Amino acid sequence: MPNRCDFCTSSSTKDKQQWTQCDGCDRWVHDVCVSITDPVSYAKYHCPTCTKTKGPSLYKRQSKRKKIDIDYAAMHSGNVDMSLRTRHVHSSRFTDVAASAQNKEPFKRVSGTELTLDWAQSSDGLNEPVIVPKEYKDTLGMYIPEDLTVRQVAEAVGMESPVEVINVVSQNGSPGWNMGKWTEYYEDIEGRDTILNVISLEISASALGKTIVRPTLVRELDLVDRVWPTNTDAARESKPRVSLYALMSVEDSFTDFHIDFAGSSVFYHVLKGRKSFMFIRPTARNLAAYSQWCLSADQNVVFLPDVLSPDSDIYTVHLSPGDTMYIPSGWIHAVHSPQDSLVVGGNFITPLNMKTQIDIAGIEVRTKVPMKFRYPLFAGVMWYYVLQLLANPERLNTMSTKERDGLNSVAEYLSGFIKTMSPTMKDVQYRRFVANFPMEIRPFPGKTLLDYCAMLDFYPKGVQETVDIDIRKKKGESKEKHKIESQLPEEKILQGSKLESKEEVQTENF
């Protein structure tokens, strides 16, 4: 969102509610400061500076770039009716870049029979998005009702069930919606006066969700299904629910660039309509640029590919009804809906992408992603993974190289996670924190972590400090110290660990 005009002449805030972007330098200006009375009359607008170097503004001619008139003051104040009069500011730019010859889809379109667990575990398996076209959908080991409708989704979860609806222009939530109201909006094509989107309706616990079978590869890779306990009602109830979503988008919906929470992988099956994706390869340089973009005050008006280096890899994928796509861990992407669409998909953490998943969880902390948009109980999944490996150490001898390469990252992550414990945490923060620790490792989870490190023969710097950390929150009491008989051999303390400070290892923004 623009926050500065280089030509300010008025001190009145009221006069500065309308902005226009210069086509010459891309700066945003207050209309009142540059005497713009009718911004939509320009085919190409030049600010006073650009007028001197690029010539005057042009009127009533076809511009190469469609002008977008967005009331940012209304968006900022939450006035939804005023802010939803146009497309998302990046929709046209997305279409232009997607049409560029160098951004054509490079990814494989294959039969589902090729996407085996052995393939995923290989060095070149599931490193890039991969598409299974409609003609091969029966090879995925998947069942989703192909005639599913938005109304049937609503009936399955309950018409009165609340649903998170996204205001496409602002990319913020629009409160007060339930599935009944959403269904009426979606079906009333002529009556729509806004562009709204539903992308976070989790349906695995619904009657509909219980009839759906995810692709075989997803079920084989899903770490939560592998490690989360199911022996008690409480354990089953607390299991993270991210495996099945119904995504319902109207024409011209747009989701800005993002990475799925905690770097989780995605499967995505289109039932109705078409979807267009723009992917950015998750290189270290691109992830750094993405992090800076997320923190920028101008994020809403800056198209991410425009701030990447010219040689960055950007790819476009178009999906039609019946197509299925896998999105690997960490890929940055934006999504546009050229038509009304209905999609069933889901997220899954894998044991093959631990370092990437943990790195993305760290980016979420640094970019201040709200807790509601992070992977639920991510650290808890890591602990149950550790417990399973400790119970079956022989797995180290048979696991794939990809999985083994991520084990040290888990140790580093959990060492840092324990150290975020503070007796001064607010109650809600503490409850969120402690919920990640299985009962069998409380109140001193560092002992379990040390056992895991011993199994790996890998000791992150400072891991010994975790052994004495009691995660019980005690007010007005001295903390009992927990001692262990054996201490870490000094030569095992890693001096080169990247985890040098509490700030760097913090994994939850409590």
UniProtKB/Swiss-Prot annotation:
Residues 216-365 form the JmjC domain. Keywords: Chromatin regulator, Dioxygenase, Iron, Metal-binding, Nucleus, Oxidoreductase, Transcription, Transcription regulation, Zinc, Zinc-finger. The keyword Amino-acid biosynthesis does not apply. InterPro entries: JHD (IPR041070), JHDM1_Histone_Demethylase (IPR050690), JmjC_dom (IPR003347), Znf_FYVE_PHD (IPR011011), Znf_PHD (IPR001965), Znf_PHD-finger (IPR019787). SUPFAM superfamilies: Clavaminate synthase-like, FYVE/PHD zinc finger. It is found in: Nucleus. Binds 1 Fe(2+) ion per subunit. One of its GO terms (cellular component) is nucleus. Its main location: nucleus. Substrate binds at T255, K275. The keyword Transcription applies. Its cofactor is Fe(2+). A zinc finger (PHD-type) spans 2-53. Residues 475-510 are annotated as: Disordered. One of its GO terms (biological process) is regulation of transcription by RNA polymerase II. Residues 477-510 have a biased composition (Basic and acidic residues). It catalyses: N(6),N(6)-dimethyl-L-lysyl(36)-[histone H3] + 2 2-oxoglutarate + 2 O2 = L-lysyl(36)-[histone H3] + 2 formaldehyde + 2 succinate + 2 CO2. Fe cation binds at H258, D260, H333. It is an enzyme of class 1 (oxidoreductase). It comes from the Eukaryota. GO terms for molecular function: histone demethylase activity; histone H3K36me/H3K36me2 demethylase activity; transcription coregulator activity; zinc ion binding. Its EC number is 1.14.11.27. Belongs to the JHDM1 histone demethylase family. The JmjC domain mediates the demethylation activity. Histone demethylase that specifically demethylates 'Lys-36' of histone H3, thereby playing a central role in histone code. This is JmjC domain-containing histone demethylation protein 1. It comes from Yarrowia lipolytica (strain CLIB 122 / E 150).
